[in-house]
A protein has these predicted regions:
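Short, conserved micro-motifs composed of acidic
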Residues: 19-287
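N-terminal signal peptide c-region/cleavage motif recognized by signal peptidases
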Residues: 13-14
């Protein structure tokens, strides 16, 4: 019996040790800070090949009618390194919204958009939470609706839609999680229906687990606070149960988050390098 037990322990230990981050993350990437402003730049999401959308507050061209600039969306062209305001025309009332847009995600055919924005009323704790909005784009019109599971007392942020599995990931501080903000998911049923929201247990911890994204192989990436180092980026490999911290250069002494695989040659993330500093956006490209 002792021999069998020892063999089982050896097998389990071997499985844990064999688990690793995807091979392409150990390639020789060149780091470049591509967006550095006096604003907070974050919320990176892939739009199409060679383009990504991100969030920023206070950039030139944004409305400054408020004492604190609102968060809005911008487009980055990897080929030209140019930033331009993201065209929100046709996205229901999003263009006219005076409130902050927290982050956004697109289906691969760009016919479905999921975004977080703050509500217009305070909740029972006295702060204004974020809600998730679904935008379905037709040829001549678009339809916007608040996701049916949203409770106005809690925040729902950082959506990521995986077209391959028709699954929407997001973070929320709603009750029932492990603590702080947890990562949740729901699967699409038909055109307008969604499954019951589920907690992504293997990824979550008693701390804030934030900015979920997937790569083409369905490996999950997210960030959580680690001691005095700030936010670190973790990977939950497809089929695994234990998240792994990414190797350098993706994690640094500072806040590293919003890891987005544009393709296997280009990875984008947000980083706060200095305490109380602004977040900038970095590009990692293969040599």
């Amino acid at each position: 019996m002792r021999v069998i037990f020892a063999v089982l322990l050896s097998i389990i230990a071997g499985q844990v040790l064999a688990q690793d981050v995807p091979d392409f993350l150990r390639s020789n990437y060149v780091e470049r800070r591509i967006i550095k402003t006096s604003s907070d730049d974050f919320g990176v999401t892939r739009l199409a090949k060679g383009y990504f959308v991100f969030c920023s507050n206070g950039r030139k061209g944004m409305a400054r009618a408020f004492s604190k600039p609102k968060v809005d969306l911008f487009l980055y062209d990897l080929a030209t390194n140019k930033v331009s305001p993201f065209d929100k025309s046709g996205l229901c009332d999003i263009e006219k919204s005076k409130y902050n847009i927290g982050s956004i995600s697109f289906s691969s055919d760009l016919k479905n958009v999921f975004l977080s924005r703050n509500r217009d009323l305070k909740n029972y704790e006295g702060y204004i939470p974020f809600e998730l909005v679904q935008v379905d784009i037709e040829e001549q019109k678009s339809e916007c609706s608040i996701m049916s599971f949203v409770n106005s007392d809690y925040s729902y942020q950082q959506p990521f839609y995986d077209t391959k599995t028709e699954t929407l990931f997001f973070v929320s501080n709603m009750p029932g999680g492990k603590g702080g903000y947890d990562i949740y998911f729901t699967r699409r049923i038909g055109k307008f229906g969604w499954s019951a929201v589920q907690n992504l247990e293997y990824a979550n911890s008693p701390y804030d687990d934030l900015f979920p994204t997937l790569d083409a192989e369905s490996n999950l990436y997210f960030s959580r606070p680690v001691d005095a180092r700030g936010l670190e980026i973790f990977c939950l490999p497809n089929g695994a149960r234990i998240p792994l911290a990414l190797p350098g250069p993706f994690n640094t002494v500072g806040d590293d988050f919003n890891f987005s695989v544009i393709d296997k040659r280009n990875i984008v993330l947000a980083r706060v390098s200095k305490r109380n500093g602004n977040s900038d956006i970095f590009l990692y490209s293969l040599k």
